[in-house]
């Protein structure tokens, strides 16, 4: 199993529960960078990127910041939300933190 798959699987289950199976699309395009697109009544409403770490806090690497910039730009074009779902470990348990992509790219967009 590849790194991060468990976090993506957990995230997909939560998104399907919230938005319905037909409205959650797994994206497999490397150059774009996001993991999931969320639709509602034929309109794109959210772009979700999933990140995982074995530490308590996740800090994006320069390559990941560039990926987040692309996601943010895409979300601006399509007028939708862009979120990072961050799975961290706390005392052996996985915890989820949901943040706006904009928080991590600051004024760099």
Language-model segments: residues:
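Short acidic/glycine-enriched loop/turn segments that link adjacent beta-strands
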Residues: 30-33, 92
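Acidic-basic catalytic patches of nuclease active cores, encompassing PD-(D/E)XK
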Residues: 1-27
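Short secondary-structure boundary/capping segments within folded domains
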Residues: 26-30, 37-41, 76
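A structural micro-motif
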Residues: 22-23, 45, 80
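Structural signal for conserved beta-strand scaffold positions within catalytic alpha/beta enzyme cores
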Residues: 26, 49, 84-86
């Amino acid at each position: 199993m590849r790194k991060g798959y468990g976090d993506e699987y957990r995230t997909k289950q939560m998104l399907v529960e919230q938005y319905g199976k037909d409205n959650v699309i797994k994206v497999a395009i490397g150059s774009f960078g996001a993991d999931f697109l969320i639709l509602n009544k034929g309109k794109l409403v959210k772009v979700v990127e999933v990140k995982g770490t074995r530490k308590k806090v996740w800090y994006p690497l320069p390559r990941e910041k560039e990926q987040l910039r692309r996601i943010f730009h895409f979300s601006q074009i399509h007028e939708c939300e862009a979120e990072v779902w961050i799975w961290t470990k706390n005392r052996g348990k996985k915890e989820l933190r949901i943040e706006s992509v904009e928080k991590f790219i600051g004024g760099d967009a």
